[in-house]
Amino acid sequence: QDSKAPAHMFFKVDDGWIAAYNMGEFGAAVYWFNSDGKKRRKLSDHQINQFMVDNGRIFAVEGLAHLGLSRGSMIELRKEKGQWSAEEFIPFPGSAEAIAQVSSGDYVIVTSDMRLRVNLEKELNILIPNGDWGSLYPNSAAIADDGYIYIGMRQFVVKCKLSISVQSFTFLVPDKAWLNTKKE
């Protein structure tokens, strides 16, 4: 991946920036750049979709869903002895598209077709094994005070109970006036 291309996503760190380039099936890369951009170092080929910080630790969810293949993970970005690294923290059975923090060390992960719950002890629970929303491209997740998680995707929002025991979901569909009805 050419690090001079526009970054898909970036994250400010104490000595510069972590930049993620994600071109889907055409490749990906994660780079560290110093503050003025003159120095850089490639960290990995992970396909980062979202960064998250928990108690000073930097995590990201990553993955690729393409032509029937879906793989992903949660990675941790760490600085040791002045050098940044990106290492897999826990693998997932699908492309990790979004993450939401339930509490410190406890997260909900949205994959291309599933909803997972993971923690820093690397325990993984599959809450919704087949969300059947892959073609809607989930891309964000938020936990609300009402006990629900809301998953943003193409033209829809999915509403799920945050509870581990309740594993159903509802599609929130906007009024027809809001839908993309342009025909080409």
Task: Locate predicted features.
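A short beta-strand motif characteristic of beta-propeller blades
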Residues: 1-2, 38-43, 84-90, 124-131, ...
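Acidic, serine/threonine- and glycine-rich low-complexity intrinsically disordered segments
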Residues: 1-35, 41-75
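Repeated scaffold domains used in trafficking and secretory/extracellular systems
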Residues: 2-13, 44-56, 92-102, 134-146, ...
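Conserved beta-propeller blade signature
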Residues: 17-19, 58-60, 106-109, 148-151
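Structural motif
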Residues: 25-31, 67-76, 114-119, 155-165
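Loop/turn-rich, solvent-exposed surfaces of beta-rich toroidal or solenoidal domains
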Residues: 90-117
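Ankyrin-repeat and related helical/solenoid repeat scaffolds used for protein-protein interactions
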Residues: 108-110, 115-159
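Blade-level signature of beta-propeller repeat domains, shared across WD40, Kelch, NHL, RCC1
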Residues: 143-184
